[in-house]
Amino acid sequence: MSRGLGDVYKRQPIDSCDFSLSHYEADGDEADASFESFSFARVEKYILPMLADAEAAYGGRLEIMLSPWSPPAYMKTNGERNHGGKLKACYWKRWAEYICRYVEEYRSRGFNVTMLTLQNEPKAVQTWDSCIYTAQEEKIFLRDYVWPSLAEHNLTDIDIYIWDHNKERAFEWAETIIDAETDHMVAGIAFHWYSGDHFEALRMLRERFPKKKLLLSEACIEFSKYSAEDNLANAQKYAHDIIGNLNEGMSVFLDWNLVLDELGGPNHVKNFCDAPYLFDTARKQLVERELQSYIKHFSHYIETGAVRIGVSRYTDKLEITAFQENSKIVFVLLNRTQEAIPAFIRLNDTCAGLIAASNSIATGVVNI
């Protein structure tokens, strides 16, 4: 890609999530089993125009992941979108059909939905849209309801990612779900970063399930935990996690929000967060955050189809990842310390010295 972030993967919610303006459902009518009242108007008004503009700027099609935060309130044991609750057993089939309808609505309008998760953060009871599953329940939902519905609608070309929650429990979840019956249904494991690094968990997943893709489906800096003023620290957190994940087998990193307002919203439960761009609504100005430049070191230079290659380092003060594509190698070097650190980049019999400046990130491109 000649310009921009090179960010071609996007995740969109099935119905509302915390970053929606308010709760909404395409069809919240319990009596409407055939979805006669299903309305895509909200998505058409707020989401599709931005996706279309992004594709026009990119000059190609984005790859879109769909994820539900909650089934319609009437389908749940607690009768509301928020505060967890479970999907009632009598609605498992209808909910699977609802998800298929969402995929069809996007695709019928020309948008390239290629990925699907079954539930955002299935172990989290949130003050916003949420729903709880056990690993066994997600397995049954996938095997007996979602996959058959996808097959009925000729949608089995979509990649299904299980889990979609923090890294530290991803291995046990995958162990429960993936077996001889479900292996062909599961393209990979999606994960978030909110409980810490847990790079070892990704290593175990890669070793146990070498043919499954590892995909980070959500990451953002919550202003409830981190300061908006810590622009550099927030950006470094991203780079540290991306490098650690890539080195353990991650193939896609999906940032949660590309653009938010100056408060880190809108968010209907005030769960404000950082983003690569913040839009100042008073001045009508787009403010580029440090996150943008740090993410660009990966998304702009490491192109789709590049293959990760092995690296080693003499000190843990430097973090590095490297990829090869055709006749070039791209490496990204991160120094989060307060000191400049010397380093040598060696490839076969060729060696080049450099200084990694304090609090810096650098990308190198080596023609081979």
Model region roles, listed by residue range:
Residues 300-301, 311-348, 359:
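Carbohydrate-binding surface patches
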Residues 1-5, 9:
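Single conserved hydrophobic/aromatic residue that forms the stacking wall/gate
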Residues 356-368:
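C-terminal beta-strand-rich structural cap/linker in extracellular carbohydrate-active enzymes
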Residues 10-178:
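Substrate-binding cleft and catalytic face of glycoside hydrolase catalytic domains
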Residues 213-293, 310-313:
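Aromatic/acidic polysaccharide-binding cleft in carbohydrate-active enzymes
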Residues 92, 132-239, 247-248:
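Noncatalytic carbohydrate-binding groove/subsite architecture in carbohydrate-active enzymes
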Residues 6, 64, 116, 189, ...:
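Conserved, mostly hydrophobic/aromatic
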